[in-house]
Regions:
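Interfacial loop-to-transmembrane junctions
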Residues: 164-185
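Juxtamembrane boundary at the C-terminal end of a transmembrane helix
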Residues: 192-205
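Short hydrophobic "helix-edge" motifs at membrane interfaces and signal-peptide entry regions
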Residues: 60-62, 159-162, 174-175
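Transmembrane alpha-helical segments of integral membrane proteins
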Residues: 153-167
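Alpha-helical transmembrane segments and their membrane-interface boundaries
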Residues: 2-144, 148, 169-170, 182, ...
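Alpha-helical transmembrane segments that form the membrane-embedded catalytic/substrate-binding core
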Residues: 184-192
């Protein structure tokens, strides 16, 4: 015989869960809405990049990896900051310390290494599938410069979001990753455009 109390128990458990974890839902929802908005803006920027994509064939192979890499690197950076804030290793202030310096250095090293790796893979895929593409030199310059530019922008933004959310009683683990992913999407494409202009300037000499 079916126990008629089960639906009531489920509803009670769900309402209790939502009541006890309301802050998680609120923080996560706000962060995801910002992430969705950032992705929409990034899509608009990409739609305006057709001129550059025609001028630099093969660049479209590089872009998805560059966007994903930025979110992964700084999402991890934000997670490490959150952990260090929770256990008291660092304070939510823009003050350099050994732990913060190590995290910043690791982010720069990862960005440089993965940008170089991404450029080589993008060129390799273009050759493998017989796509028309720019030279490996151009791939490397665009990828590495875009990585450095994004790094300079994303580091203070990541620290600001982590520190501010922690100061205001929000759990950085709930808000930083989606928001950082949105900013990564948003700034990677303009960084690539700036890198293209720098490359065009270099090619004049």
């Amino acid at each position: 015989m079916m126990d008629k109390s089960h639906p009531k128990m489920i509803r009670t458990s769900l309402s209790t869960f939502l009541k006890n974890h309301n802050f998680i839902v609120k923080e996560g929802l706000i962060a995801l809405l910002i992430c969705a908005l950032g992705d929409l803006v990034a899509g608009i920027i990409l739609g305006k990049m057709t001129f550059f994509l025609k001028m630099f064939p093969g660049l479209l192979v590089l872009i998805p990896g560059a966007i994903g890499m930025r979110g992964n690197i700084f999402g991890s950076f934000a997670s490490r900051l959150s952990t260090n804030l929770h256990i008291g290793i660092i304070s939510p202030k823009f003050e350099l310390s050994d732990d913060l310096n190590h995290n910043i250095f690791a982010s720069f090293v990862l960005t440089l290494f993965l940008s170089l790796f991404l450029a080589i893979v993008a060129k390799g895929l273009c050759l493998l599938f017989n796509f028309e593409s720019i030279s490996i030199f151009d791939f490397v310059i665009i990828s590495v410069l875009a990585g450095i530019i994004s790094n300079i922008i994303m580091l203070p933004i990541t620290m600001f979001i982590s520190f501010k959310s922690f100061k205001h009683g929000w759990d950085p683990d709930n808000v930083t990753t989606p928001i950082i992913a949105a900013f990564g999407d948003l700034f990677t494409l303009p960084a690539i455009i700036i890198s293209i202009y720098i490359l065009r300037f270099i090619n004049k000499f």
